[in-house]
Amino acid sequence: MKSVLGFKKAKANREKISMVTCYDYTLAKIINSTDIDCILVGDSGGMVLLGKKNTTYTTLDDMQFMTQAVANGATDKFIVADLPFMSYRQSLEITMQAVTTLIQSGAHAIKLEGSSGNLDIIKHIVNSGVPVMGHIGMTPQFINSFGGFKVQGRTEEAAKHLLEEAKLLEQAGCFGIVLECIPANIAKDITQNLDIPTIGIGAGSNTDGQILVLQDMLGMNTDFQPKFVKKYIDGSKLFSDAINTYVKETKANTFPTKEHCYDYC
């Protein structure tokens, strides 16, 4: 997927959209060689890459650093970058400075969380020439309001509110919406009532696409295994085994061998 137009085309053709998160150059280069449609430089990188407590601690400087790294590695992919916590809630000027920073760092679009209080901001960003992706449901930047990472939309009233939010985001100009940790039937209803694609994470299989944190799907984080994540490999074990093999060979002096040495060895 080369541009935001690919999202609209995929929705029209009923083609599923695949997305993963990425935060660094090395993994971005690998992803660039795959069939993945889109990369999200998520504020989750503050947790996954930098070890921060939650995404409210991720800064614009963090996002700039990660976006530049990913853009340098994934030169053929469409890149969306998260606006970090409070970067779009202080003033329009501060918001647009943050948007400019991420776009000039290599992002092709930005994502922000929630609808209430954001609609005029989204319209302004879109009218400024920057595509915007919405995000509703379990929005991690609102963790303190939610009282933790909890599934949203489990009551009739909450489900109705999510649909209303999605429609408002579409009307404001969003080209797509992430639906996070909501019941599958609610995600299906939202998807069927929008002309823009929905990207699910913990939202069932009836969304227009899926997104996962790369390190989660690669099994690199043994301490975080939510229900909605499928581990495609046991990355933690693969890496640990490789490192331990290197340690053993070093101590046994079986590495390096002649093939790893220059002529003077």
Swiss-Prot record:
Instruction: Name the domain of life this protein comes from.
Output: Bacteria
GO cellular component, alphabetical, reads: cytoplasm
**Which Gene3D superfamilies does this one have?**
Phosphoenolpyruvate-binding domains
Reaction(s) catalysed by this chain, per the record, are:
3-methyl-2-oxobutanoate + (6R)-5,10-methylene-5,6,7,8-tetrahydrofolate + H2O = 2-dehydropantoate + (6S)-5,6,7,8-tetrahydrofolate
Primary place of residence?
cytoplasm
Biological process per Gene Ontology, one example term:
pantothenate biosynthetic process
Q: Which residues bind Mg(2+)?
A: D43, D82, E113
Keywords attached to this entry: Cytoplasm, Magnesium, Metal-binding, Pantothenate biosynthesis, Transferase
Q: Which GO terms describe its molecular function?
A: 3-methyl-2-oxobutanoate hydroxymethyltransferase activity; magnesium ion binding
Give residues annotated as binding 3-methyl-2-oxobutanoate.
Answer: D43, S44, D82, K111
- Name of the top EC class for this enzyme: transferase
Give the record's cofactor note, including how many are bound: Binds 1 Mg(2+) ion per subunit.
Keyword Transferase listed: yes
The EC number(s) given in the record are 2.1.2.11
Q: What CDD domains does the entry give?
A: KPHMT-like (cd06557)
Q: Where in the cell is it found?
A: Cytoplasm
Which coenzyme or cofactor does it need?
A: Mg(2+)
Residue positions of the active site: E180 (proton acceptor)
Q: Which NCBIfam families match?
A: panB, PRK00311.1
Note the subunit structure: Homodecamer; pentamer of dimers.
Q: Return the protein name.
A: 3-methyl-2-oxobutanoate hydroxymethyltransferase
Q: Which organism is it from?
A: Francisella tularensis subsp. novicida (strain U112)
